[in-house]
Design a protein with these regions (language model features):
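Acidic/polar residues at beta-strand termini and the immediately following turn/coil
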Residues: 22-23, 110, 122, 139
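PAS/Per-ARNT-Sim sensory domains
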Residues: 48-76
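Sensory-domain boundary/capping and coupling elements
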Residues: 1-6, 127-142
């Protein structure tokens, strides 16, 4: 069991910034797993909308703010999750003085649809690799 826990922790540290969930009955966000190396983390417990009202204007890239304010609203998330099982929001977040690309994967915890689960990953390296690959393809075509 100890080895399994160590493997799980190493995967979390490498792959995600945090895992949190929102109880749709009371609108409270609860953070259950965090990567100590990640910046801009949600509180352990707090009002979901109030957290967004503070963090989005402060940390989200100006060009992504309006989209994040709209797409992260609980009503909007529930609308989008009626159409598909998972919803992903990609945006830029100010971390340590520079903007990093983040991907938030959101889904329902179970069939009761009373709890939303949020998993945030840093995808900056993947994004930059893809941009470089696209540039190389473009340059090769010229």
């Amino acid at each position: 069991m100890e080895k399994q826990r160590a493997i799980l922790e190493s995967v979390i540290k490498e792959e995600i910034d945090f895992i949190s969930y929102v109880d749709l009955e009371d609108g409270m966000v609860h953070t259950i797993v965090t990567n100590e190396d990640a910046d801009v983390m949600p509180p352990i417990d707090g009002d979901y909308q109030k957290v967004n009202d503070v963090t989005i204007p402060k940390y989200v890239h100006p060009e992504d703010r309006e989209m994040c304010e709209r797409e992260f609203r609980l009503e909007r998330l529930q609308e989008n999750l009626q159409k598909k099982e998972r919803f992903v929001i990609n945006y830029r977040l100010l971390c340590g003085g520079e903007y990093r690309r983040k991907s938030m994967n959101i889904h329902y915890y179970d069939k009761t649809k009373m709890t939303l689960v949020f998993v945030r990953r840093d995808v900056t390296d993947n994004y930059e690799e893809e941009q470089n690959r696209q540039r190389e393809i473009y340059d090769a075509m010229l």
